[in-house]
């Protein structure tokens, strides 16, 4: 193979001398083009320009992969959000730990909002007729609430087990199919602004065991503080999801996330009783939660807050003075004073009669 050597001239052209001695004149355009291209490429110390261009391609590909599922958006904290649009308004479906879970949540919402012909992320995993009937039996707001609370799968499973797949509404589990666990009378702090329910320690460790880590194991202690999610079904067949954890600071077991909403919707007050139970039959040990109102406490609160009712038949007296109607608010007080005065007058009169005529006075008294 011949060796080629280059030499530049004053005119900017270059000549190539071959091994045989022949000179070949070469045009300066390629050199100028290469120099211009070299000026346009950024020069990074220790990194080749070609390598820099190649490393920028996976970033663009990753950005495209983040939106490969319909209705899924990445979150700054590493989680994935799901959303759907209804009449040009965004409906937020919640956040999920992975992209596939968010995509499945979007598919559920799409089936409820747009019917069985809706475009979904997983068309191969088509919903069954029973699931479509379950979606049709609930409103859009109810389905969105299930997705946000991550209880859709549990409610769907319970609904299909009870035969609600063909559009029937929720049927509560009968009392004879439940095994009572324990009861707890809520305190003012349980229904106050602390947004938590303290579960008695003996009942918590017996019925809701939670693995507690030693204080030396910081990772396990953090996981214990975060707690677990427990699903409960109320007397109306609605599923509630609470975060159940152990607080090292107070050494107590508590229900936190989801409890304030339960208190608000059930209208709980201090003195009411929470009843915990579980299913007595079947392979799945379902948990149940119910509340019993304290009617005595409610009546006491009502009487203390309300004014003394007036007689329905008696109307307030109105006096017209100088063309202005003045309602007498203390008419009843004046009537009571007059009645008391009449009683005192009659008593004095009876005493006088008794002094004058003892026999007649004794008869009157």
Curated annotation (Swiss-Prot):
It holds the Pfam family B3. SUPFAM superfamilies: DNA-binding domain, DNA-binding pseudobarrel domain. SMART domains: AP2, B3. Keywords: DNA-binding, Nucleus, Transcription, Transcription regulation. PANTHER family: AP2_ERF AND B3 DOMAIN-CONTAINING PROTEIN OS01G0141000, B3 DOMAIN-CONTAINING TRANSCRIPTION FACTOR ABI3. Disulfide bonds: none annotated. It is found in: Nucleus. One of its GO terms (cellular component) is nucleus. GO terms for molecular function: DNA binding; DNA-binding transcription factor activity. Residues 68-123, 182-294 bind DNA. Gene3D superfamilies: AP2/ERF domain, DNA-binding pseudobarrel domain. Coiled coil: none annotated. This is AP2/ERF and B3 domain-containing protein Os01g0141000. Residues 1-24 are annotated as: Disordered.
């Amino acid at each position: 193979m011949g060796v080629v050597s280059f030499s530049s001239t004053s005119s900017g052209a270059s000549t190539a001398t071959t091994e045989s001695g022949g000179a070949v004149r070469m045009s300066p355009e390629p050199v100028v083009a290469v120099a211009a291209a070299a000026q346009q490429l950024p020069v990074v110390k220790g990194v080749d320009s070609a390598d820099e261009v190649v490393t920028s391609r996976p970033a663009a590909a990753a950005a495209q992969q983040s939106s490969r599922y319909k209705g899924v958006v990445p979150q700054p904290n590493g989680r994935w959000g799901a959303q759907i649009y209804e009449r040009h308004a965004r409906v937020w479906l919640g956040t999920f730990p992975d992209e596939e879970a968010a995509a499945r949540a979007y598919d559920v919402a799409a089936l409820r909002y747009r019917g069985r012909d809706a475009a979904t992320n997983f068309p191969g995993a088509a919903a069954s007729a029973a699931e479509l009937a379950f979606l049709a039996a609930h409103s859009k707001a109810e389905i969105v609430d299930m997705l946000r609370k991550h209880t859709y799968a549990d409610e769907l499973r319970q609904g299909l087990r009870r035969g609600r797949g063909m559009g029937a509404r929720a049927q509560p589990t009968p009392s004879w199919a439940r095994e009572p666990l324990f009861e707890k009378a809520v305190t003012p702090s349980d229904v106050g602004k602390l947004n938590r329910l303290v579960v008695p320690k003996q009942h918590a460790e017996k019925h809701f065991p939670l693995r507690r880590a030693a204080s030396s194991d910081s990772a396990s202690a953090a996981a214990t503080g975060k707690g677990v999610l427990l699903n409960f079904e109320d007397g109306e067949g609605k599923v509630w999801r609470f975060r159940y954890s152990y607080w090292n600071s107070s050494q107590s077991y508590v229900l936190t996330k989801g409890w304030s909403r339960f208190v608000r919707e059930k209208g709980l007050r201090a003195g009411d009783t929470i009843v915990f139970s579980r299913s007595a039959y079947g392979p799945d040990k379902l948990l149940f939660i119910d509340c019993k109102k304290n009617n005595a406490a409610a009546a006491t609160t009502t009487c203390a807050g309300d004014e003394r009712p007036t007689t329905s038949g008696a109307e307030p007296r109105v006096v017209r003075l100088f063309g202005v109607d003045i309602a007498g608010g203390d008419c009843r007080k004046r009537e009571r004073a007059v009645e008391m005065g009449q009683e005192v007058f009659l008593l004095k009169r009876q005493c006088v009669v008794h002094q004058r005529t003892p026999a007649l006075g004794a008869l009157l008294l």
